[in-house]
Amino acid sequence: MFSGGEYEEVARWLRNFVASHAKRENLRAEPVVDTEGPREGQSFGVRLRLGAGLHPAPPAPPLELGFPEVAQNRGSLAWCAGLAARVRALARDLPAAGSGPLRTA
């Protein structure tokens, strides 16, 4: 498996990972991974977007992940399984909006 990497590469991996697992619960969920400002090079703030809304909605804090934690553990199946469970729980908690399937078959 793979671990480590530059901040931008790890952010891209995290965005894809969050999208993949969120969409298993809600096909309209989109990942929002905050990497700017004081987070840049240090950490990631993860939220899910459904339409115009974010979850967790500000002022509630996003799911916080440190860059070293993600970079070091993204190759660990156990760590990824735990993160996937957290992301899927966020997606299940998204408020219902719009129409269409919320889950994959």
Language model segments and positions:
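Residue-level recognition of well-ordered beta-strand positions that form the cores
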Residues: 34, 47-49
